[in-house]
């Protein structure tokens, strides 16, 4: 039996023998593609190549691509564990042609691999083609020799492939495997096609078109080929099993899942869910995603929590999910070394998330169970589903999963309506602005010269206004200029774009920002003098001081990144950065606040490298060579075949396309100004360098001097004086609180108390006290009386504050919150609370006596009723 591991290698080796360049899997996070939540196909990393935007030094490629389908259009989560072939994470075997071979060779390669390399019986194979694709039919029938009756024309989207609503697309041909007559199901295109007898194993897409947002299509620059064959699916065929979960890789994970959950039935769908989900979670974390309440982090959290619940369902009594990581590394670590490198981070993240979820799941399940007990039909309301999501962290699909197990459904539309209301509430007010620059899709190439110079003579290739090409631009009109060569750095890798001037005979264009569009560099700004035309000659000048300050901050981020790893641990991976002339911002993975001692260690390490004045060296080399040198590749960054490696002594070596200082000493000084959390498991450091670091130090020193002068202290006794002052303030606050309490007690004789039956009613205004004192007095009344209604107010200038207490024994007669609303209506205020306690305030103290009189009447009327 061929193992999954062997099959993966056999596929790569076959296509390498056909002159295909083996390219590593790209990240599950599609870089620079906002149309996709996750990488869901092998061609995603080559999308710009198919569009003609990006050039490669090879025209044939083979990959084994990590893919995820658990959000957005491509979402298989609900079916995972309950069918034979649905997964969240899967591996896609693929071979690609970029304007090289087309239909004849693509079909021939696939047929040879299936029938010669892995020796599938020809009589077991069927194919489909797009109904009008006569060229593909001729290749199958005339060149391959496949009988006409085994070639099925399909006139539907099944045989016309697209990655999404926009992007590369084209007709495809699919190869199916026949599991035999003893398995239910019919041929593709028949009513029985959804059965398991005929299984699609390979999809070959002939990339001929680019689909635009309006639905129209245009020809791609060169016809290309994109193929995909699910590794798990073809493994099942070769291992003679009908379910992907029966292949060797999944069986190992399922057995481990049974062991750690103590499940009795190894055939339980829950174990399949767990085995599938550990792959998705581990690879997402390894690719830099951490659990969160939105975006990709929320999808990860959903998958983790779904796995946890299925573990609890089959018997897990303690945290278990992280225990599968070791077996996953054993099964897939050889093919994906990131699992080995990030194993500790993966396990720690899963442990933390499971502990967090277990704290809330019990209460959530109680709410769920209580709701279904009171159901009048078989539908759980969207409001309840939203409460479970918003309060207890239950993803909608988890609630739907629990409902399905009990034969119920959830009102998804009502849930989505609640979600929309929440989004609308949190949406920032503001006018919507169209970013016309994002509409620019330039096809020209600009040569970047800015590593070695800040001044360059250049020629105008394109001018844009409102996203449209124009022949010229006039003064004060926002515009974008594309040059044949430029010293201006375009924003990327966290570094902001340069600022400066484009000047020529009779004109001056101020550059406010610089971005990229394909291989074009966009100079964004406006003309302040004269007129600028296509083909004009000009001089491009980068503002030197902002560039130098930005370079210092960028180099400092490299030193900071390394220092974080040395002080906090290897898990401290970069999650994002922002580098400009004023500061640097660095986001990284770490699960707790950094101590003052750790911050000092980090600053010392960075400043030691600055004082060492190491040369900052740059080499350009292949990705493989860079990796062998130990260069750090950063999360979310997209690299070409040739990469730029930045080294700072023996301390730091990273792949980077940004601008840097010549020597670490040019950074001057490094100072951290803030550190805090921005998401679960993600911290942020902000820091300054050079003159700004010195000024920051001066500012803090001046503050300390001012404090010393105010306290008449010196360096030796400053801390003791502050501690003494704080202790004195604390004692005085206690004394003030005591005096206020005595004041209130002394006023008790003036407080009007009445009895309505056996209920004591207290309504009074007391000046000179605070809300805490009022609360304490209310508690005193309630502790001494089994049936009491107490309304106490205090005024300060125009302001009114109040506290209301009602004994629990009489909250069925009247509620504190209702009294608060009544009082608020008379003092231009607002307030509320529980049935037994409420508080609030208002802005009209002038008629407080009249307001309290109305409250007395309100209480009397409600009690009598």
UniProtKB/Swiss-Prot annotation:
Its cofactor is Zn(2+). GO terms for cellular component: cytosol. Binds 1 zinc ion per subunit. Its main location: cytoplasm. Zn(2+) binds at residues 554, 558, 656, 660. Its EC number is 6.1.1.7. Keywords: Aminoacyl-tRNA synthetase, ATP-binding, Cytoplasm, Ligase, Metal-binding, Nucleotide-binding, Protein biosynthesis, RNA-binding, tRNA-binding, Zinc. Pfam families: DHHA1 (PF02272), tRNA-synt_2c (PF01411), tRNA_SAD (PF07973). It is an enzyme of class 6 (ligase). GO terms for molecular function: alanine-tRNA ligase activity; aminoacyl-tRNA deacylase activity; ATP binding; tRNA binding; zinc ion binding. It catalyses: tRNA(Ala) + L-alanine + ATP = L-alanyl-tRNA(Ala) + AMP + diphosphate. One of its GO terms (biological process) is negative regulation of DNA-templated transcription. It is found in: Cytoplasm. Consists of three domains; the N-terminal catalytic domain, the editing domain and the C-terminal C-Ala domain. The editing domain removes incorrectly charged amino acids, while the C-Ala domain, along with tRNA(Ala), serves as a bridge to cooperatively bring together the editing and aminoacylation centers thus stimulating deacylation of misacylated tRNAs. Belongs to the class-II aminoacyl-tRNA synthetase family. Catalyzes the attachment of alanine to tRNA(Ala) in a two-step reaction: alanine is first activated by ATP to form Ala-AMP and then transferred to the acceptor end of tRNA(Ala). Also edits incorrectly charged Ser-tRNA(Ala) and Gly-tRNA(Ala) via its editing domain. This is Alanine--tRNA ligase. It comes from Francisella tularensis subsp. novicida (strain U112). The lineage of its organism: Bacteria, Pseudomonadati, Pseudomonadota, Gammaproteobacteria, Thiotrichales.
